[in-house]
């Protein structure tokens, strides 16, 4: 397979594209991250999600520290070709570094942000730094 398919994407001026990771079974949105060309290429090659960390300025293989990898079942490109949607099998059932299933665990209710998802596992037990 050639890399021409990467040229179809409307990359940002920084060479990035936002990526939504969605649970393949329930359809729940797990997280939003970023990819550059190399991250997307490695994701396709390995079958596991590899993102670009904007804060650390390096590739980030999801689950490299926690073991909570994302097995990619499908990759979709939106109509404007500037957002990716990954359908994933979330290993360990935890996508968020806070120990929750989803990074979207706060909901606006009556003008206040309310936590709507429990912590599945204490992050101190996940990350041993």
Curated annotation (Swiss-Prot):
Keyword check for Metal-binding: yes
Catalyzed chemical reaction(s): 1-(5-phospho-beta-D-ribosyl)-5'-AMP + H2O = 1-(5-phospho-beta-D-ribosyl)-5-[(5-phospho-beta-D-ribosylamino)methylideneamino]imidazole-4-carboxamide
Entry's EC annotation: 3.5.4.19
Cofactor(s) demanded: Mg(2+); Zn(2+)
UniProt key word Metal-binding: yes
GO-annotated molecular function: magnesium ion binding; phosphoribosyl-AMP cyclohydrolase activity; zinc ion binding
UniProtKB keywords: Amino-acid biosynthesis, Cytoplasm, Histidine biosynthesis, Hydrolase, Magnesium, Metal-binding, Zinc
Database matches in Pfam families: PRA-CH
Binding site for Mg(2+): 78, 80, 82
Cofactor info, note text: Binds 1 Mg(2+) ion per subunit. Binds 1 zinc ion per subunit.
UniProt binding sites for Zn(2+): 79, 96, 103
Biological or metabolic pathway of the protein: Amino-acid biosynthesis; L-histidine biosynthesis; L-histidine from 5-phospho-alpha-D-ribose 1-diphosphate: step 3/9
GO CC list: cytoplasm
Localization (cell): Cytoplasm
Function: Catalyzes the hydrolysis of the adenine ring of phosphoribosyl-AMP.
Subunit and interaction comment: Homodimer.
NCBIfam families: PRK00051.1 (NF000768)
Recorded family membership: Belongs to the PRA-CH family.
Designated name of the protein: Phosphoribosyl-AMP cyclohydrolase
Species of origin: Nitrosomonas eutropha (strain DSM 101675 / C91 / Nm57)
């Amino acid at each position: 397979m050639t890399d021409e398919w990467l040229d179809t994407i409307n990359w940002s001026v920084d060479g990035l594209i936002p990526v939504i990771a969605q649970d393949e079974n329930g359809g729940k949105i797990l997280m939003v991250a970023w990819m550059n060309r190399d991250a997307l290429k490695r994701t396709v090659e390995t079958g596991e999600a590899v993102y670009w960390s904007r804060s650390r300025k390096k590739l980030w293989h999801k689950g490299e520290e926690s073991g909570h990898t994302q097995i990619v079942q499908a990759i979709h490109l939106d109509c404007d070709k500037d957002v990716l949607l990954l359908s994933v099998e979330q290993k360990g059932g935890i996508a968020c570094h806070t120990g929750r299933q989803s990074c979207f665990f706060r909901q606006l209710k009556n003008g206040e942000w309310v936590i709507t998802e429990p912590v599945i596992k204490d992050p101190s037990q996940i990350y041993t730094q």
